[in-house]
Amino acid sequence: MNKTITPSIDSINRQWYLVDAENQTLGRLATEVASVLRGKNKPSFTPHLDTGDFVIIVNAEKIKVTGKKGMQKLYRRHSGRPGGMKVETFNSLQERIPERIVEKAIKGMLPHNALGRQLFRKLKVYKGSEHPHSAQNPQVLSITTNELVK
């Protein structure tokens, strides 16, 4: 009889990956990054453990969406006060805080529990091509999602 091997916390080898979001489709990029954060690209993947890697995303302001989503996709937040709902379109949020768009898309694809919050902390999103994690020697993760963008 075979036994399932659960990797120990010490045996998990974490890598750092760098993803350039320039001209990438938002949802397609988010699914690939969520998979790497979760650790599904490793043979030691375990659903209830954090076996994933760190991901750095640069050029978040240059991400694309298809169709009319730039004007039609809405991002909502609420202050908790009566009448405190704020609604913003994709284009206006991309001008203001482009990192939030990518973070929100990826966070929605992670588990909605304590494990998902732990996985989300390994995601680093930056506007522009500069990032402060060069000491970790991130490997470039090439994701080709822009076949459908015109």
From Swiss-Prot:
Protein name per Swiss-Prot or TrEMBL: Large ribosomal subunit protein uL13
Sorted UniProt keywords: Ribonucleoprotein, Ribosomal protein
The keyword Transmembrane is annotated on this UniProt entry: no
Quaternary structure, from the entry: Part of the 50S ribosomal subunit.
Species in which this protein is naturally found: Prochlorococcus marinus (strain SARG / CCMP1375 / SS120)
InterPro entries for the chain: Ribosomal_uL13, Ribosomal_uL13_bac-type, Ribosomal_uL13_CS, Ribosomal_uL13_sf
Function: This protein is one of the early assembly proteins of the 50S ribosomal subunit, although it is not seen to bind rRNA by itself. It is important during the early stages of 50S assembly.
UniProt GO cellular component terms: cytosolic large ribosomal subunit
Gene it is expressed from: rplM
Family the UniProt entry places it in: Belongs to the universal ribosomal protein uL13 family.
